[in-house]
A protein has these predicted regions:
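Helix-coil boundary and interhelical linker segments in multi-pass alpha-helical membrane proteins
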Residues: 2-10, 34-53, 95-118, 164-170
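Final/C-terminal transmembrane alpha-helix of multipass membrane proteins
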Residues: 152-169
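Interfacial loop-to-transmembrane junctions
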Residues: 138-156
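Cytoplasmic-side transmembrane-helix entry/capping segments in multi-pass membrane proteins
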Residues: 78-89, 147-151
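The first (N-terminal) embedded transmembrane alpha-helix
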Residues: 17-35, 161
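Mid-bilayer segments of alpha-helical transmembrane spans in multi-pass integral membrane proteins
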Residues: 89-97, 118-135
């Protein structure tokens, strides 16, 4: 474990929270695949379900449904309580998963301390991603004079960002 990892992982936990703020299910789907492939070591934790055989497939299907639903005009704002809360929970859980992937012996923190640090970083990232993503999308939609191109760009940013974070962990 290098000292840089002690800085990198909280940043990644924050960033996966941002991704969850953009798309609530893209972040857990990406981390679930990372756990399934053995890149994210959460098998001996309360997040072991992320690596179970069916979980990545299920989360991927749900993420795809979210991407489709987001393009529909009747989809509620991400800032309504249920949508906002879902993104916060997703960001917090994903942040915890990233932090718990660290080599605990090298860091000198307990699993609970790592999970708490990840929960907080992911939660803050989710707030930033939810509110910032909404603002950027509104700005882009005004420039495009339509919402769908802005939504597709946001989808691409969420997917590519999640892949980048997973590749940094792998």
């Amino acid at each position: 474990m290098e000292e840089d990892d002690m800085i990198l992982f909280p940043v990644l936990a924050f960033l996966i929270g941002v991704i969850a703020g953009l798309r609530a299910l893209v972040a857990p789907a990406a981390l679930s695949w990372a756990a399934w492939f053995g890149w994210l070591h959460v098998a001996d934790s309360w997040l072991a379900f992320l690596g179970w055989g069916v979980t990545p497939w299920l989360l991927t299907l749900l993420a795809l449904a979210e991407l489709v639903a987001d393009q529909l005009p009747a989809t509620p704002s991400r800032k309504v309580p249920l949508q906002f809360g879902t993104r916060l929970v997703s960001g917090a859980v994903c942040g915890a998963a990233l932090m718990m992937a660290l080599d605990l012996n090298a860091v000198g923190l307990s699993r609970a301390e790592m999970a708490t640090e990840g929960l907080v970083a992911g939660l803050l990232g989710a707030v930033a991603g939810t509110l910032g993503g909404a603002g950027v999308r509104e700005w882009l939609a005004a420039r495009f004079r339509r919402d769908s191109p802005a939504g597709l760009l946001e989808d691409a940013a969420a997917i590519l960002g999640a892949l980048g974070i997973v590749s940094a962990v792998a």
